[in-house]
Amino acid sequence: LLDLDGTLIDSYPGILASCLAALRALGHEPDETLDIRRTIGSPLEDIMQILLRSYGDDRVGEAVAAYRQHYGESGLLGSVPYPGIRKSLEEMKRTGLRIYLATSKRAIFASRILDHLKFATYFDGIDGSVPSGELDHKPELLAHILSKHSLSPSHSLMVGDRRYDISGAHAVGMRALGVLWGYGTRDELETAGADQLVDSSADLAGTVLSMLNGKQSL
């Protein structure tokens, strides 16, 4: 199971643009140099709550709606794959691994991004958050994916760049590989208990295959 933002793609420019647009839609004048890298990977509601706090504003729902409108119109196209990711996906697919996307991003946005980058064909399933909010957090999302696709936790692996990916995987009985080219730090991933870390996106496929030892899920 692969995370999206900070794992497969650098989505920061588009996410930042949509966050700024959401704050402006609520009447605020945000700093254009705002750095939100460390919040990426959190549920969107949590990100907006953090951003609105400095304005004494609690209109989280309105901010989320404004963000999603802007992101759906233009923000999602500001994503670029990390070096070597396409080759890693090709290599993993070639070995027969089943590959699933597991992102806190809205599933419809994730699908559009993968289609835009021509990554969709590598995936056996694309899952993300849904309008009802029931899959906003990683443990619930991963449990849903495992059940939906009849996957065994002990034969599967979660790959991500934030502590939410690691703790979410462990909560449902999966191992977790932390990637160091995304938005989380080595300390964050180690503290969360990542089973292994990988430094370079070019080494992703090799590390995944080594951890799985030929087992047929990802």
Predicted regions and their residues:
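Non-catalytic pre-domain segments flanking phosphatase-related domains
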Residues: 1-2, 214-218
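N-terminal helical cap/lid subdomain that shapes the substrate entry/recognition surface
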Residues: 1-87, 95, 108
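Structural recognition of alpha->loop->beta junctions
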Residues: 118-128, 188-208
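Acidic, Mg2+-coordinating phosphoryl-transfer loop and its flanking beta/alpha structural elements
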Residues: 157-198
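Short acidic capping loops at alpha-helix termini that bridge into adjacent secondary structure
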Residues: 30-35, 58-59, 121-125, 153-157
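Short beta->alpha linker loops
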Residues: 39, 43, 80-84, 105, ...
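Substrate-recognition/cap helix-loop segment adjacent to the acidic, metal-dependent catalytic center
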Residues: 24-26, 47-54, 78, 86, ...
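Phosphate- and divalent-cation-binding pockets in alpha/beta enzyme and binding domains
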Residues: 18, 47, 84, 109-112, ...
